Curated annotation (Swiss-Prot):
The gene is TIP3-1. Keywords: Acetylation, Membrane, Repeat, Transmembrane, Transmembrane helix, Transport, Vacuole. Residues 48-64, 130-146, 200-225 are vacuolar. The chain crosses the membrane at residues 27-47, 65-85, 109-129, 147-167, 179-199, 226-246. This is Aquaporin TIP3-1. Water channel required to facilitate the transport of water from the vacuolar compartment to the cytoplasm. A motif (NPA 2) lies at residues 207-209. Belongs to the MIP/aquaporin (TC 1.A.8) family. TIP (TC 1.A.8.10) subfamily. SUPFAM superfamilies: Aquaporin-like. It is a multi-pass membrane protein. One of its GO terms (cellular component) is plant-type vacuole membrane. Disulfide bonds: none annotated.
Length: 268
């Protein structure tokens, strides 16, 4: 999978939104985000149903439940990124797309279309989960008891920073060469590991679409802003640090009137 060799900031060409490659990439983001959120949120609903029927407490609040949820997220994201990587780059996360935008690896038009696709994919996944589970409300994310807003925000910043840094080092860095299956595997593993760290405190979302779908369908908005602000700050920090401190310094490419040639679907 090729990557853009140089940073190129700009809004994008007017015809980029209707270009066949852009449409295919947007569809890939929609489908992969759907697959990821359906499996990830579904694993939580499945555990809750099992524990509601056989115990007095929710399964996700137990050590075993935490491990199972982390594994489900890791496996699902590994599969989702692998499925989309050669078409869209396999973002499957608005925060990853934002980091690529901040780093000059995608145009603003491409980022907007990815965000819309990712959010719609997450919403559809949660709607189908509610339908197929006979009305169970998606759980989504909220801060645990005793965890303040600042604590949760900083935790989401750190967790997302780690995720996007791994994405940059395995997928975006133009010096990396082809890593094949290692890239989506590494991304899935860091998400699983981060859930083991942050799950008991903030839920470890790291993904605004992953948080938005359950919040909308389950109508659970408590602390929701944290799961947008934290991941976006963390992704921007990771992108800027990797672009300007890890990747050799290069002058940004500017084009007339803020417009540049659209990047290929996998160039981010």
């Amino acid at each position: 999978m090729a990557t853009s060799a140089r940073r190129a900031y700009g809004f994008g060409r007017a015809d980029e939104a209707t270009h066949p490659d852009s449409i295919r990439a947007t569809l890939a983001e929609f489908l992969s985000t759907f697959v990821f959120v359906f499996a990830a949120e579904g694993s939580i609903l499945s555990l809750d149903k099992l524990y509601w029927e056989h115990a007095a407490h929710a399964g996700t609040n137990t050590p075993g439940g935490l491990i199972l949820v982390a594994l489900a997220h890791a496996f699902a994201l590994f599969a989702a990124v692998s499925a989309a990587i050669n078409v869209s780059g396999g973002h499957v996360n608005p925060a990853v797309t934002f980091g690529a935008l901040v780093g000059g690896r995608v145009t603003a038009i491409r980022a907007i279309y990815y965000w819309i696709a990712q959010l719609l994919g997450a919403i559809l996944a949660c709607l189908l989960l509610r339908l197929t589970t006979n009305g169970m409300r998606p759980v989504g994310f909220r801060l645990a008891s005793g965890v303040g807003a600042v604590n949760g925000l900083v935790l989401e910043i750190i967790l997302t920073f780690g995720l996007v840094y791994v994405v940059y080092s395995t997928l975006i860095d133009p010096k990396r060469g082809s890593l094949g299956i290692i890239a989506p595997l590494a991304i899935g593993l860091i998400v699983g590991a981060n859930i083991l760290v942050g799950g008991p405190f903030s839920g470890a979302s790291m993904n605004p679409a992953r948080a938005f779908g359950p919040a909308l369908v389950g109508w659970r908005w408590h602390d929701h802003w944290i799961y947008w602000v934290g991941p976006f700050i963390g992704s921007a920090l990771a992108a800027l640090i990797y672009e300007y401190m890890v990747i050799p310094t290069e002058p940004p490419t500017h084009h007339a009137h803020g417009v540049h040639q659209p990047l290929a679907p996998e160039d981010y």
